[in-house]
Amino acid sequence: MKVVSCNYRVKNVKDIETPTYTILTNNITPEYINLELLRKIDKKFIINCSLLEIYNNLDVFEKVKEYFSSNKTNEVSGHYLHEFCDFQDSYRYLNIRNVLVDDYNINVHKFISLKYDNSTAVFSIDDYIKCLKIFEPDIFCIPCEEIKINEQVGKKKKNRIINLMNEFLEKVQIIKNTNLSNSLCILSIPCTVDIDTVITETINKYDSIIDGILLSGLGYDESNETRTNAFKNILNILPNNKLKFIQLSNGNPIEILHAIYHGIDVIEPNFPYYLAKNGKAINMNLKMDNLQDGNEYNLQDKNNDNIYDINLLDFKNDVNFIIDLNNPKYVLDHSTITCNSPRKESKSYIHHLLKCHELTAHVILTYHNLYIYRSFFQEIQLHIKENNFLSYINWFIEKNELNKKEE
């Protein structure tokens, strides 16, 4: 069968192989889980550190940096934050939007205005540069207004977005050549806005300092079909050698496969955390043991009823895919969460913890869900390398019955 030429690929962020995902945080600490537990799931990972939280605690980081810089001896090595916050074996990603937060808004004009829930901060571009200099992230994202699909944007606003983008890049270029020479610069681009020509000029001008692109304005409630159109429009004009990032307020497996199919390298999904927060566990088959003739499926072959077009498919049939451990039917169920779970706790025990409102339940479920997602990404990497990723997509949909229509 003919192999479809697509953008999915294996690359690297630092020494982490992609496609991969990031660890989401609240107050610069992982949601429900600590770094020690995360290291049991993966040797190295990218940890999100939101700009608002860094800015609100900048005076603390500044004092810490001062202290460790003045007291540093030859025996002490590594970044000062590793001594202070135990960020060892992680890459700190200074990001703008926190996908764990529903009520998010960013406005970039003369000042940057960030709002998460009830917390708001207003600061200048120079304040942002100061955050970079003090926090010294391994990866950082340049702020841009979040413009969702179907949001109307006039010519004046488009020009303002590009002008501010150039202003940010001009200042970042200076510190990239001094303080942050080893840090990756990710440019946030509103891919829902028609700015093809001018954005190409900006990327070409600052090509030497731009390491990746964040496709902003996507990852909310739009369907895969709608998102596909946005992908096609923006990815056609972006250089292929740049890393591609996306933030998904859901980030379920179908959305993950869809994003990777279109060449996204780093995904920020909320799915594992949202489920754990609500007492739910991911239950999915991951390992495709047998290939059908070792060939790729042609996703464009509409005559084959057994082929699923990932561009048109949305996440359905979560009844078997998600285990709701709040359900009383698990009171006497002494089996583990799933057959491929890294945890030994029984469903009945976790149900009991949830009923008693014990935080331990969310810790266990977060660990389980992140482990399953890490295994999922490892399988994806494997099948891309073996040139059967499209087969894996089709197998995954069939095996997990994600193709069933809602009743």
Curated annotation (Swiss-Prot):
One Pfam family of this chain: TGT
SUPFAM superfamilies the record matches: tRNA-guanine transglycosylase
Superkingdom in the source lineage: Eukaryota
Gene3D superfamilies noted in UniProt: Queuine tRNA-ribosyltransferase-like
One Gene Ontology biological process: tRNA-guanine transglycosylation
Family note: Belongs to the queuine tRNA-ribosyltransferase family.
Protein name, per record: Queuine tRNA-ribosyltransferase-like protein
Native organism: Plasmodium falciparum (isolate 3D7)
